[in-house]
Curated annotation (Swiss-Prot):
This is Potassium-transporting ATPase potassium-binding subunit. The chain crosses the membrane at residues 2-22, 60-80, 130-150, 173-193, 246-266, 278-298, 374-394, 412-432, 483-503, 525-545. Belongs to the KdpA family. It comes from the Bacteria. Its main location: membrane. It is found in: Cell membrane. It comes from Bacillus cereus (strain B4264). Part of the high-affinity ATP-driven potassium transport (or Kdp) system, which catalyzes the hydrolysis of ATP coupled with the electrogenic transport of potassium into the cytoplasm. This subunit binds the extracellular potassium ions and delivers the ions to the membrane domain of KdpB through an intramembrane tunnel. It is a multi-pass membrane protein.
């Protein structure tokens, strides 16, 4: 029965992807999508803010994005620092320590949601609502806006206006869908209140304080925007965030909704729907491979316990919630790292070595399917690399969407693809070379190495999940992961927008019999191979020293 539920969940992922992709294309291309509802609201926002609907250059678009995001980071930083004297603080929580406030503000603006604090004890209701939830809408709206400009550039059209795209992302995508999802979560038992904690009497007569809050509205945008941060420290393992299997499936659907839709949006916007379909199918195959690998490993259990003759029919149950089980915990771990969300319904630090390898690889590749917007930019980056390599092998000038791929584009892509592993491996080496980093490690040996690399991988990929055995709430970890999150977020977005702008200016080369097609299964295979090979060449030595070595040791 459990496998039937898994298959149905997978089918739901597939069934909602195309309609959502069609809706996104219409919403951002000026087609009518509930204009009577959203149009007046958007015009009012433009009038109040003074936004004018004109086309920007790629530099203007990128500058608008960075300045708006930077302003939001500063505002939210001071909210966190001053929450102790601000209203909506029934628990009388004090202001955040400076480096933690720095880390948290960047974390949520970068759509990472890395949390070095426990949500219910670290933030007031004002900080949760005005600080965290606000950024949970703003962060994915930023990248969804940018990816639309990116696709327009690839299609040879004007990039558009960042502020217009940002507003449409909020009004036509995130606000309505998150509102409906929040109502469903309330119906499923997720609390939504501004009241403080309640005191309950336990069976043995003791008193217990039960924390609550505006959780349903928080969880809906947490998953839809691929944010992932928890209202509670336990994240989606907490019964108030994720009461049962229905809420669990809904959370996974929200996580996958926009990342899986964007390939179809792309296909429609560039005028070749097959392009989108082949990307969707190729990435879904990689996703399935990851799910099968982690599930098999977790169902086989811990090799160390197997050697003791201990039977565990449910597989490796450590760190998992009984109400979800091993299979759905494995699926959730695959989804949350494939969609770069970072929400967890099981503790990733307790996964088996190979089970923990899958989330790590998903984040290192950062492209299966990746988070809202940013992930799709990485997908196209790998697609262009695949075209470039194929062109070199047959002695032709590489072409993508009828545009020649030349030195300028490849230099930008080369720098971008190297920057991701440089952040991860460089900062991991720094942490491992100083007591400021190693003092936080709770496990020695191979697993300790994986803890460190996982933290920086999660930060660079804007995922936010963690091996929570790492004691990371220190100035060193707060500052270094904050820098990694900021650089990992904005560097690739800006460089790839420059690539799209460069391709926009090029004339379309007529298609001939020798043109390498990018809308068939051959390209799909080369595309997958490029992702795997580039990822393996970059990160394989670290994976051997970490999870693979741990697995072989336990065996």
């Amino acid at each position: 029965m459990i496998w039937v539920a898994v298959i149905i969940t997978m089918l739901l992922f597939i069934l909602v992807a195309k309609p959502t992709g069609v809706y996104l294309e219409k919403a951002f291309q000026g087609s009518k999508t509930l204009d009577k509802v959203f149009g007046p609201f958007e015009k009012l926002i433009f009038k109040i803010t003074g936004v004018k609907e004109y086309n920007q250059t790629w530099k203007q678009y990128a500058l608008s994005l960075v300045l708006l995001n930077g302003f939001m980071i500063v505002v939210v930083y001071f909210i966190f620092r001053l929450q102790g004297v601000l209203p909506l603080n029934p628990a009388h929580i004090e202001g955040m320590e400076p480096t933690l406030a720095f880390n948290t503000a960047i974390s949520f603006m970068a759509d990472t949601n890395l949390q070095h604090y426990s949500g219910e004890n670290g933030l007031s209701y004002l900080s949760q609502l005005i600080g965290i939830t606000f950024l949970m809408f703003a962060a994915p709206a930023t990248t969804l806006a940018l990816v639309m400009a990116f696709i327009r550039g690839l299609a040879g059209k004007e990039l558009g206006n960042f502020f217009v795209d940002f507003t449409r992302a909020l009004t036509r995508v995130f606000l309505p869908i998150a509102f409906i999802a929040a109502l469903v979560f309330v119906a499923l038992g997720v609390p939504q209140t501004l009241d403080g904690a309640v005191t309950a009497q336990t069976i043995d007569g003791a008193k217990q304080s039960i924390l609550r809050g505006p959780v349903a509205s928080f969880v809906s945008i947490k998953e839809l925007g691929n944010n992932g941060g928890g209202f509670f420290g336990a994240n989606s393992t907490h019964p108030f965030e994720n009461p049962g299997q229905m809420s669990n499936i809904l959370q996974m659907m929200l996580m996958m909704l926009l990342p899986t839709a964007l390939p179809f949006t792309y296909g429609r916007m560039v005028g070749n729907k097959k392009q989108g379909r082949i990307l969707f199918v190729s990435l879904f195959m990689v996703f399935l491979l990851g799910f099968i690998t982690i599930t098999t490993s977790e169902l086989n259990g811990n090799p160390a316990l197997n050697g003791m003759g201990i039977e565990h029919v449910q597989g490796s149950a450590e760190g998992k919630e009984v109400r979800f089980g091993t299979v759905f915990s494995s699926l959730y771990a695959t989804v949350t790292t494939a969609a770069e969300t970072g929400a967890v319904n099981t503790m990733h630090d307790t996964l088996t070595p190979i089970g923990g390898l899958v989330p790590l690889v998903n984040m290192m590749l950062n492209t299966v399917y990746g988070g809202v917007g940013a992930g799709f930019v990485n997908i196209i980056m790998y697609a262009i690399i695949a075209v470039f390599i194929s062109g070199l092998m047959v002695g032709r000038t590489p072409e993508f969407l009828g545009k020649k791929i030349e030195g300028k584009e490849m230099k930008l892509i080369a720098v971008t693809i190297l920057f991701h592993p440089l952040l991860i491996l460089g900062f991991s080496a720094l942490a491992l070379s100083t007591n400021l980093g190693t003092d936080a490690i709770s496990h020695s040996g191979f697993h300790g190495l994986t803890q460190v690399v996982y933290e920086y991988t999660s930060s660079a990929a804007n995922n936010g999940s963690g091996f929570e055995g790492l004691g990371d709430n220190t100035p060193f970890w707060n500052i270094t992961t904050g820098l990694v999150m900021f650089l990992g977020r904005y560097f690739s977005l800006i460089t790839m927008l420059a690539v799209a702008a460069s391709l926009k200016e090029k004339t379309v080369v007529p298609e001939t019999v020798g043109t390498f097609r990018t809308d068939n299964s051959l390209f799909g295979g080369i595309f997958i191979g490029t992702i795997v090979i580039v990822g393996a060449l970059t990160f394989f030595p670290m994976l051997v020293l970490g999870p693979i070595a741990e697995f072989l040791t336990l065996k």
